[in-house]
Amino acid sequence: MADKKGSNSEKLLYCSFCGKSQHEVKKLIAGPSVFICDECIDLCNEIIRDEAAAAGVEASLSRSDLPSPQEIRDILDQYVIGQERAKKILAVAVYNHYKRLKHLDKKDDVELSKSNILLIGPTGSGKTLLAQTLARLLNVPFVIADATTLTEAGYVGEDVENIIQKLLQNCNYEVDKAQRGIVYIDEIDKISRKSDNPSITRDVSGEGVQQALLKLVEGTMASVPPQGGRKHPNQDFIQVDTTNILFICGGAFDGLEKVITDRTEKTGIGFGASVKSKQERDAGEVLRETEPEDLIKFGLIPELIGRLPVVATLGKLDEAALMKILVEPKNALVKQYHKLFAMERVELEIRPAALQAVARKAIRRKTGARGLRSIIEQALLDVMYELPTMKGVSKVIIDENVIDGDGKPLLIYEDTPKVAGSN
């Protein structure tokens, strides 16, 4: 009933859906013999939005909308500088994976297996950014997990199922969406076993975690606790099938190039033997020759390597690549700082020599692209601290001396240039 008589004989109106009176809600909208309140309208809009978003994910993965490998590569180029071979390998692997999902419902004699991906490359070479960009491009749930925090079930640390729990959180616990997501497991090299022989002692954060990851990566029905954390006997679990989740594992694998070099450059003895320094070859070039036996010798178990059939290697970024990373991508660091200063109505100019100094410093620190922001932050700290309270500044100029710590930013006022911090 949409209306009732009040004690003062005036007609009191009620929402036909939730039963709240007109005094309990902000607005009551009338229809033919029915009323609906603003709260119910908001709830309906939310339901429609969620269903539209779910339909959007399905539509985005349909064959007609699934970008081709070349289109995936072109989009990766907008965000990631260099690493051309790795981008091509990833584009093909991701395209084939979601093309396979599109045809799951079709009955066929040939069953297509999942091809998970292993990314090998130094810190700051773009492994995580590549995975993040792929997930954003495909509009699928995405989560980053740190392998170093994982332990075997029953020990202090995170169970491997917690990775899937985080994936569920990222898509509001919609199981169907989570089952088509992407999981990036970082620092996979840090859980290598201590020797290439099977362990006879318990290694709960190394080989034990690799064993725990096996079924998850290959495809299993994972029992996920809804609120995360450890499992409890009286707890209800969410069942998630990981068969169609794409797993991308990444790691720096420091020392792997030595393992590969020892295998490929077995020199002879005598006057005819070729004497060649192992340092002559670029590390990225060496890593491209990675074979499963090298990864086993490094400390990954053969079973896990077999479940990561697509291997993409990334090389170290040189000075020219780091300078491009600073200015060329859509969300390049220099563009971000230009925007920050523009909010203060100040123009920021970072001169080419300063960009070169930033790149050189990142190479010295061996942090790759990941260390670029901290270098610029350090150089701009004083001027960003003082700028909001300064009057009349129209432009800030950064040269190489500022980056090297030998000078201060040049501030351009209406007519007279001044140095930051000078009176």
Swiss-Prot record:
Residue stretches making up the ClpX-type ZB domain: 3-56
Keyword terms: ATP-binding, Chaperone, Metal-binding, Nucleotide-binding, Zinc
**Which classification does the entry list for the species?**
Bacteria, Pseudomonadati, Pseudomonadota, Betaproteobacteria, Burkholderiales
Q: What GO terms in the biological process aspect are recorded for it? A: cell division; proteolysis involved in protein catabolic process
A Gene Ontology molecular function term of the record: unfolded protein binding
NCBIfam families documented for this protein? clpX, PRK05342.1
Q: What does this protein do?
A: ATP-dependent specificity component of the Clp protease. It directs the protease to specific substrates. Can perform chaperone functions in the absence of ClpP.
Cross-referenced HAMAP family: ClpX
Name under which the protein is recorded:
ATP-dependent Clp protease ATP-binding subunit ClpX
Q: Its domain of life?
A: Bacteria
**Subunit record text:** Component of the ClpX-ClpP complex. Forms a hexameric ring that, in the presence of ATP, binds to fourteen ClpP subunits assembled into a disk-like structure with a central cavity, resembling the structure of eukaryotic proteasomes.
Q: Which organism is it from?
A: Burkholderia vietnamiensis (strain G4 / LMG 22486) (Burkholderia cepacia (strain R1808))
> Which residues does the record give as Zn(2+) binding sites?
15, 18, 37, 40
Q: Which family does it belong to?
A: Belongs to the ClpX chaperone family.
Classification via Pfam families = AAA_2 (PF07724), ClpB_D2-small (PF10431), zf-C4_ClpX (PF06689)
Residue span of the signal peptide, if any? none
> What Gene3D superfamilies does the record tag this protein with?
1.10.8.60, ClpX chaperone, C4-type zinc finger domain, P-loop containing nucleotide triphosphate hydrolases
Q: Cellular component GO terms, alphabetically?
A: HslUV protease complex
User: What residues bind ATP, as annotated?
Assistant: 122-129
